[in-house]
Amino acid sequence: VTDDADLVARLRREGLEPSSWSNGPHDVYGAHDHGYDKVLVCVQGSIRFGLPAIGSSVELAVGDRLELPAGTTHDAVVGSAGVTCLEAHLVAGSLGDGPRRIASGEW
């Protein structure tokens, strides 16, 4: 089991400064994008990110990571237990092409 402090430390070792946010069960974010690259790590609960440009979605559970390059349109639906995520921003172009999910234990 990975705790929040370990996940924060792992991101900081990459030169990232994560912040934390939470949402209640079944909260919804409409489709949007950002002008910066974003790294997300789920630390509690779960969340599903829709990626309409590629016609798919990704589910994040505890320890899973999602990398979203700038301009990637995404929406989200929080799981039934709510969610807490760490989020860090990078200069646009830092992450390369296309979104990437990395499972817990693989990053």
Residue ranges and their predicted role:
Residues 28-29, 65-66, 70-75:
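Histidine-centered metal-chelating micro-motifs
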Residues 17-34:
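Conserved short histidine dyad/triad with adjacent acidic residue
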Residues 33-49:
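Short, conserved beta-strand element in jelly-roll/cupin
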Residues 15-16, 25-26, 44-48, 55, ...:
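Short, charged/polar surface micro-motifs in flexible loops or helix N-caps
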Residues 2-21, 75, 79-107:
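Double-stranded beta-helix
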Residues 54-70:
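Short acidic-glycine-tyrosine-enriched beta hairpin
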